[in-house]
Amino acid sequence: MARQGDIHRVTGETDVKVRLDLDGSGQCQASTGVPFLDHMLHQISSHGLIDLEINAVGDTHIDDHHTNEDVGIAVGQALAQALGDRRGIHRFGHFAAPLDEALVQVALDCSGRPHLSYSLSIPSQKIGSYDTELVKEFFVAVVNNSGLTLHIRQLDGVNSHHIVEACFKAFSRALRMATEIDPRRAGAIPSSKGVLEQAGAN
């Protein structure tokens, strides 16, 4: 059974389309109008082996906030849709990714219980034209719409680009670990309760 999500979200501020395949090969087409966000979406796809097709048109003439957030919402919804009842997955994932002097650790649980614990200390306010406070806003949107429990910890780093890119790489590898099928589970739901919540899977 294909583990795919297909979301089209339209508001007065943005028009976002996301297609996602958890069992992909890392193919990515991302056009959001926010170049640094596109670069980070490529990290999720490439290192998570998730096929992503994302197109967004938003009010970037004002700023990148609405587009950044709505892309995160749509990615979270597509992820929830692709996971369904989360039957047969490993559920938990953890990875620490270095990028030169930066080291970021991510742990996550596909629990259906949205929570973000975030401790990046990004020195600069901007990376190119991208406002670095939008990194957290992206993950807030993903978490709230996918039902992930997500912990992000910066262990080292002084270069803003390196810190953020290491974060996205660690997230992608932890997500891949958590969402891959566990052959020992034989299709069972990975919970002692026998059920996991399906936040965002509308």
Curated annotation (Swiss-Prot):
Catalytic activity: D-erythro-1-(imidazol-4-yl)glycerol 3-phosphate = 3-(imidazol-4-yl)-2-oxopropyl phosphate + H2O
EC number from the UniProt entry: 4.2.1.19
InterPro entries on file: IGPD_sf, ImidazoleglycerolP_deHydtase, ImidazoleglycerP_deHydtase_CS, Ribosomal_Su5_D2-typ_SF
Principal localisation: cytoplasm
Top-rank taxon: Bacteria
Entries under Pfam families matching the protein: IGPD
Record-level GO BP terms: L-histidine biosynthetic process
Top-level EC class: lyase
Alphabetized GO MF terms: imidazoleglycerol-phosphate dehydratase activity
Stored CDD domains: IGPD
Protein family membership: Belongs to the imidazoleglycerol-phosphate dehydratase family.
Protein name according to UniProt: Imidazoleglycerol-phosphate dehydratase
Lineage of the organism: Bacteria, Bacillati, Cyanobacteriota, Cyanophyceae, Synechococcales
Gene: hisB
